[in-house]
Curated annotation (Swiss-Prot):
Protein family: Belongs to the prokaryotic/mitochondrial release factor family.
PTM text: Methylated by PrmC. Methylation increases the termination efficiency of RF1.
Pfam families per UniProt: PCRF, RF-1
Protein name: Peptide chain release factor 1
PTM sites of type N5-methylglutamine: 238
Protein source organism: Rhodococcus jostii (strain RHA1)
Domain of life of the source: Bacteria
PROSITE patterns recorded: RF_PROK_I
This protein's UniProt keywords: Cytoplasm, Methylation, Protein biosynthesis
GO MF terms held by the record: translation release factor activity, codon specific
Gene3D superfamilies: 3.30.160.20, 3.30.70.1660, 6.10.140.1950
Locations listed in the record: Cytoplasm
InterPro entries the record matches: PCRF, Pep_chain_release_fac_I, Pep_chain_release_fac_I_sf, Prokaryotic/Mito_RF, RF-1
Amino acid sequence: MAGTTQPSAIDDILAEHAGLEQQLADPALHNDPSAARKAGKRFAELAPIMATYAKLKSAQDDLDAARELAADDSSFAAEVPELEAQVLELDKALTDLLAPRDPHDGDDVVLEVKSGEGGEESALFASDLARMYVRYAERHGWRVEILDATVSDLGGYKDATLSIKSKGDVRDGVWARLKFEGGVHRVQRVPVTESQGRVHTSAAGVLIYPEPEEVEEVQIDETDLRIDVYRSSGKGGQGVNTTDSAVRITHLPTGIVVTCQNERSQLQNKARAMQVLAARLQAAAEEAADAEASAGRQSQVRTVDRSERIRTYNFPENRITDHRIGFKSHNLDAVLDGELDALLDALGKSDREARLAAE
């Protein structure tokens, strides 16, 4: 087949896809739910590659036929350039699909929002960010669960932990879209507590982790854990549960603390807290093992300081600016209502270009 796609790469994919198809058709596989999920997820990841390859093969066959016809009848010659362009476009698309990618792109995520400098205004902005991600998830049919939240006096979030899951096995999951959101987000607006109408600057931080499919994928020694239980609390710290159902898990070797209080029972809260802990430990282990991953993660929140910003939300000018790529748009209300695709597409494009340049 003409084009730049490496034959060995696509041959490997074809063989893997055929093998997965056989596995998934075997009823015995589904006796092991974890293995079935992994096979299904990988099968879904390969689906766009297989579809693009089929289109490319069909277009190449059409091109070969058109060239043969044009050799005998010049009236067919006009079709050749069009088909050549189609083959080149599909070949490039297939090459992009076969390029090295983030192994977590199909994963769900744990997302944390933390208020920073700015007191109540920062907490209110943190809740605006959390709502932005919830609305974005809803637009994509994803499932969102607020695992834990500490609410400020005015109803903002001092901190909140969200679990965001995609609607099924997909090549590009939640992580592929939201992985660039980690960092310090700065807001410029007139706070509700400001009586003089002056614009203030405050900040909130976002941390995001790919969530392992199974807690067992991450090695966690029970003796390294301190588990505390307490009553779930509502707005302003008021108790909303008469039993000690909320769970706080401290991983003693790293000092990582995870809390969960939104499930119905202590057992459910512990299970969800363990999932969050596994995600954070997995991220920490990958940082330690991979210098590139470490450098990237350092761009997330170290200290929620207004000077370390990835993005600014300017209310007086209705403008959002992503400082990493120079992206600007004047639709702040829409962005905060979850219309993030244009921005996330631009960030993804910049990341792909950087990866290709580094090869």
